[in-house]
């Protein structure tokens, strides 16, 4: 799916160098079709890196996807130039009267922070409540999963003693589910989180359907039966070197982190890691766009009543 972005967005050249199909606004305006409108609430500190990762996964299908980037934290960023934020991000007030086909809420490095201590927690609640009436399907990633479970289901924050970091094996529970269509019976995906997602907790306190689990029994992929909300507790969007960057950052900070599991060849941090989850990540996002967004969203977004026959 060619993603439609502003011509000047840095991700355009970055992704083209990777042979990813990106359609700029100037080119897309000549095609007489309605693109899917997808809003990305980017909560990660390194916003440009995160943009590249998610746009890569949204790009591989014949339909257009019109991407809009959202920020809700008005504080000055230490990792992203203010000029970039001003040029390419909108504020919630700019879009609160609009409807969207899809919303992606990224992770955030807030695993050890209590929800009420998060500077933009009221804004997170506001966006999630707004999405119920203004978005066909919302996909939550990693920390955003924990936040959404608290806001939508009242589940308290669940925190691991040690950070889960590495590339883990998962297995699908419902091979005929739309979101896992085409998945291998088992697959690899990265995790980098303090948040804990026991499958039993999801089954006991929500009506969500778990579609894939880790080998240790943690819920990895789950969704509502009406396709309106979906959750992925890992980071299928990560680049090959993202976990390495986090590991060496923590080493330099004197945190004595564990070496990410099943990531560096021969468990040697000096070795170059390989991507073993790219196909899974691409298929997950393609399935979400197709079955959870495109197949149920109305042609006229003024009439939001998504259903799936």
Curated annotation (Swiss-Prot):
Reactions that this protein is recorded to catalyse: L-homoserine + succinyl-CoA = O-succinyl-L-homoserine + CoA
Principal cellular location given in the protein's record: cytoplasm
Listed pathway(s): Amino-acid biosynthesis; L-methionine biosynthesis via de novo pathway; O-succinyl-L-homoserine from L-homoserine: step 1/1
Record-annotated disulphide pairs: none
Keyword RNA-binding recorded: no
Annotated site (Important for acyl-CoA specificity): 111
InterPro entries in the cross-refs: Class_I_gatase-like, HST_MetA, MetA_family
UniProt GO cellular component terms: cytoplasm
EC number: 2.3.1.46
Locations listed in the record: Cytoplasm
Record GO biological process: L-methionine biosynthetic process from homoserine via O-succinyl-L-homoserine and cystathionine
Keywords assigned by UniProt, alphabetized: Acyltransferase, Amino-acid biosynthesis, Cytoplasm, Methionine biosynthesis, Transferase
Role played: Transfers a succinyl group from succinyl-CoA to L-homoserine, forming succinyl-L-homoserine.
Entry's family note: Belongs to the MetA family.
Record's protein name: Homoserine O-succinyltransferase
Lineage of the organism: Bacteria, Pseudomonadati, Pseudomonadota, Gammaproteobacteria, Enterobacterales
Gene name, Swiss-Prot/TrEMBL: metAS
């Amino acid at each position: 799916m060619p993603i439609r972005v502003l011509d000047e967005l840095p991700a355009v050249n970055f992704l083209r160098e990777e042979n990813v199909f990106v359609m700029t606004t100037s080119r897309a305006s000549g095609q007489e079709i309605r693109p899917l409108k997808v809003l990305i609430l980017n909560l990660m500190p390194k916003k440009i890196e995160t943009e590249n990762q998610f746009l890569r996964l949204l790009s591989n299908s014949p339909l257009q996807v019109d991407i809009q980037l959202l920020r809700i934290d008005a504080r000055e960023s230490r990792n992203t130039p203010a000029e970039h934020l001003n040029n390419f991000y909108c504020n919630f007030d700019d879009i609160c009267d609009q409807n969207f086909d899809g919303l992606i809420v990224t992770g955030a490095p807030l695993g050890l922070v209590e929800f009420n201590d998060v500077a933009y927690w009221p804004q997170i609640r506001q966006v999630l409540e707004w999405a119920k009436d203004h978005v066909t399907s919302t996909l939550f990633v990693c920390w955003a999963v924990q936040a959404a479970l608290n806001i939508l289901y009242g589940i308290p924050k669940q925190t691991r003693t040690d950070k889960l970091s590495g590339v883990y094996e998962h297995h699908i529970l419902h091979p005929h589910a739309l979101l896992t269509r085409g998945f291998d019976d088992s697959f690899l995906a990265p995790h980098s989180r303090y948040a804990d997602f026991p499958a039993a907790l999801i089954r006991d306190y929500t009506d969500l359907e778990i579609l894939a689990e880790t080998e240790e029994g943690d819920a990895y992929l789950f969704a509502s039966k009406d396709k309106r909300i979906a959750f992925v507790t890992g980071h299928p969007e990560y680049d090959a070197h993202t976990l390495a960057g986090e590991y060496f950052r923590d080493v330099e900070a004197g945190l004595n982190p564990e070496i990410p599991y099943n990531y560096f060849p021969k468990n040697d941090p000096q070795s170059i890691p390989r991507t073993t989850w790219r196909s899974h990540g691409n298929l997950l996002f393609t399935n979400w766009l197709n079955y959870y967004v495109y197949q149920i969203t109305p042609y006229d977004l003024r009439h939001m009543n998504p259903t799936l026959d």
